[in-house]
Amino acid sequence: TEAKMWDLMEYDIPVAREIQDRFNCQTDSKFTKVLAGGYMPTHIDPGRTAVVMFSLTDNPSPIIYFDGQKKLFTHQYKCATIINAKIHHGVPVNTSDRIAFQVNLYLTWDEACKMHQKGTLYDSHI
């Protein structure tokens, strides 16, 4: 099995930029795709601390968090989800194409959680 994955970091999609611009912190964004039969290796993200994931495909394979080789928990995306990118995570089994729009956050995890709880992380007003 191979990774079969890619990132699209340069794009001109106005609605994606509008979503990214509504975050009240430093962000950048990208689209990711992992093909069916591929996988996303277990990793800790090197720069970003948190990621807001917008799944663009139905029933994406779940993300799994690890402590060494031990599974901590499995999360099935059903809506936009913020993840802690500094905990080992991956998608070891990908049964269908998995496409997502990701907004990368560079706050500490605690700062991101506090802003989310206060309703200040994202400006939802049009």
Question: Where does each model-flagged region fall?
Answer:
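Non-heme Fe(II)/2-oxoglutarate
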Residues: 1-24
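Short, charged, solvent-exposed linker or helix-capping segments at domain edges/interfaces
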Residues: 11, 64-66, 112-117
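Catalytic core of non-heme Fe(II) oxygenases with the double-stranded beta-helix
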Residues: 17-85, 99
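Short catalytic/ligand-binding loop motif for oxyanion handling, primarily in non-cytosolic enzymes
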Residues: 38-42, 89-92, 109-114
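Alpha-helical and His/Cys-centered functional microenvironments
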Residues: 47, 93, 106
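Short beta-strand-to-loop capping motifs
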Residues: 56, 103-107
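Ligand-binding loop in jelly-roll beta-barrel domains
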Residues: 86-101
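Active-site or metal-binding loop neighborhoods of secreted/extracellular toxin and effector enzymes
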Residues: 96, 106-126
